[in-house]
Structures are given as C-alpha cells and as structure tokens.
Amino acid sequence: MENWNKYIPEGMKDILFEESNIKLNIEDQLRKIYKYSGFSEIISPTIEFYDVFNSNIQAIPQEKMYKLFDNLGRILVLRPDMTTPIGRITGTKMKDCTYPLKLCYTANIFRVNEKLNGKRGEITQSGIEIIGTNGIKSDVDSIVTAINTLLSLGLKNFKIELGEAGFFQALTENMEIKEENLKKLKEIIRNKNYVALKKFLDEISSKYSKEDFELIKNLPKLFGDIKIIEKAKALTKNKKALKSLDDIYNIYKSIENIGLEAYISIDLGMVQNIDYYTGVIFKGYVEEVGDSILSGGRYDNLIQHFGIELPATGFAINVDDIMIALKKQNTMSMDKDKKVLIFYKEEFLRKAYDFMQELKMKKIICELSLLDDDKEILLYSKKKGIDFIIGFMGEEKLFVKDLKSDKIAFLKKDEIENLLML
C-alpha cells in the first residue's frame, strides 16, 4: 500500500509565511468592512449533517460534497457552502430575533472537484446575508455592499453582472420539456453557444409561442448596459418576465442614484441549474481570474426548510481568487511592520526581554535571537527580512545595525525607539 504521508489531497494547498499573512490580512479587512456596514459575524461548524444540504433546491450537488460518518452511522459532510448553514441557524436559533437580520461570515468550505481541473477543494468564502426583507432595498444593499467591499480591498476593473432568476423561469414554466433537456438548454445559454441554441430550439420550436422562441433564442445576446432591458421588453408580453425586467431596472436605477453604476452590467442569459435563487442574481468578474470572484442573489425559499419562512439575499466572495486578482493587479495593500531581532549576552537577558516587550507594545515585530554567532545572526536576519539588529552587549548604549542601509550605530533605548517609529 502506497504511503501518502508526504502529500496532500488533490485540490488542497499549504499556505506559508507571507502568503498566509496576506490572506489573513484580507480576511481581517473583510470583517472590518462588514462590521462597519452593520453586519454581525457568525461561525458555524465545519462538519454538518448531510440532511442540512439535502433538499431539492440545494445549489451544491451531493457528489460535490465530502462525506463521512459519525459513530452512530449518520452521514456528515464538510460544509460545501455557508449560506445553507446560516439558513439552518436562522431557522432554529433566531426565530425571535429582530428582523431584518444582517449577518456575515468568513470561513473555509469544501467541495470535491475533478482531478487536474485546477480548482481548489478547500475555499475560503466570505460574505453577507440579509434575512427577513424582500424589497429591492435589501437587494440594492447587498449589491452595493459587494461593490464597496471589492473597492475597499483595492480591486480594480471589476464588473458585477446582474440577472434575474425569475426571468428564465417565466419563459419556460409552461414549456413541455424533459428535465434533462431543460438542463441542457440552461447550459447552452450560460455558455452563450448561439449555434447550439438555435439547433436545440429548432428541434422543439413547436412547444414555444413565437414570442418566447425569439426571446430565448436571443438570451445569450442580451447582455451589456441598461439598454438591454428595453430591448428584452420589446421581445415579450409575458407578465412575469416583464416584472423580472422591471425589478432589474429598478435595482439598477437605485445603484445609479448612489453613483456606482459604472461597476454594473446586465446579463439576462444568467441562468441556474437548480431553482435555488428566486429573484435578482449577480456575479462579480475581473480579467485576472477566469471564474467569478463573487456570486449572490435572492433566495426566498431556502430558510423554510429549517422551520420558518423568511426571504433572504446575500453574496459570497472567493477570498483565494481575490488574492490572485490583487497580486496580478499589483494592488495588494498590506501595512509593513518593522521587524527587529535582539541578540544579547546572557547577563542582559532580562533587559533584552523587557525591551522586546516594549517594542511589541508599539506594534513592532520583535524576537530574541536564538543564535550566538555573529555571521549566523546576520544570515538569519537577512533571510527573515529583519530591518534592524539590536545588541545588548553592555550597560550603556546598544548596538544597532540597519540592514537596509548597512549602517551601524550605538544608541540609547529612547533613541532606538524614535528610530523605529520613523
């Protein structure tokens, strides 16, 4: 039997040193953004019962879930998303809360992916949920929060594409078509495959009204600015479809009034495999990442599976993809703290320790040297990115070496503190 003790499973990744610091910094920024936007953070368990995710509107197929068993033989899963656990928490622990609830989270989720497809099996997901209100104000709040979050992280040249789940549903609800064919139709539209769509519709055209046929045929082309809404309205008299178009238009106009319309585009060909979303849906894209970095929308039917009927909307950000985009855009902002290494003669250990503690209180990264040899100390400091080496070698002034300028000085403690605070 092969020994895998030196490897990690497909789709997993070790995150080391600077990359780890950057990721934690992004997560910290996200938490602050949500906090100052009025959202309260919640934490759910990594392991849930499979039944939590086993519903006919679940957005994650069961074959994408990591499964295991507890000691009673019950099926468990590593959570494949965060929205469903929040639905469970809301339905079971927040029935008496004041609504609307504004919740946020940052956590790892787990999804089984095919080998060699380049996708991660463990993803850090961060997002918000607005629960208990079904007006467009909450949809606008969710989308605007998404835009401001990406801007606050320093991301450039991104777009939020708006669609409406009810639009496609309205066009196909009276259509006599097998489930597998409907799924195929959705996939063709999502991929904007005009040739395949025309061929597919020609084969079943007798099941459509002429209007619906023309509109569905044009769905892959109906993306762009707000003018797309009027173009789509001219192609249908379907009342439900028209209402969906009005909802997108009204949401767009609210975002325009705020002054963030430059980040919005419309995509009426945004359809979903499973009827998870019930209203406006949106995805965030940036050139540097091939897949969406953010997705969200209205999901009014989820929480009822946990004992209470509540409308909800929200979004989730893929933190790992955000890191990739920020790195490629060279806009990764991170405050660089000064780093200090203190070496000492044994009789000055207490003084060295006390000074290290003083520097830490001033938010300076500081450590005592575990090495005694001068050359080893210098080599370690350079590889570790240390800015200053400080030596406690006598009672008076301290040895200070600036590794950037390579200058050496002998200074008093207060002079060193002033130097480090520059």
Curated annotation (Swiss-Prot):
Entry annotated with the keyword Cytoplasm: yes
Keywords, sorted A to Z: Amino-acid biosynthesis, Cytoplasm, Histidine biosynthesis
GO biological process: histidyl-tRNA aminoacylation; L-histidine biosynthetic process
Keyword Kinase: no
InterPro entries hit by this protein: aa-tRNA-synth_II, aa-tRNA-synth_II/BPL/LPL, HisRS-like_core, HisRS/HisZ, HisZ
Matching SUPFAM superfamilies: Class II aaRS and biotin synthetases
Main location: cytoplasm
Pfam families found in the cross-reference section: tRNA-synt_His
GO cellular component, one term: cytoplasm
GO MF entry, a single one: catalytic activity, acting on a protein
Subcellular location(s) per record: Cytoplasm
Pathway given in the UniProt record: Amino-acid biosynthesis; L-histidine biosynthesis; L-histidine from 5-phospho-alpha-D-ribose 1-diphosphate: step 1/9
Subunit structure: Heteromultimer composed of HisG and HisZ subunits.
Similarity field: Belongs to the class-II aminoacyl-tRNA synthetase family. HisZ subfamily.
General remark: This function is generally fulfilled by the C-terminal part of HisG, which is missing in some bacteria such as this one.
Alphabetical list of NCBIfam families matching this protein: hisZ_biosyn_reg, PRK12292.1-3
Function statement: Required for the first step of histidine biosynthesis. May allow the feedback regulation of ATP phosphoribosyltransferase activity by histidine.
Designated name of the protein: ATP phosphoribosyltransferase regulatory subunit
Species assigned in the record: Clostridium botulinum (strain Langeland / NCTC 10281 / Type F)
Lineage summary: Bacteria, Bacillati, Bacillota, Clostridia, Eubacteriales
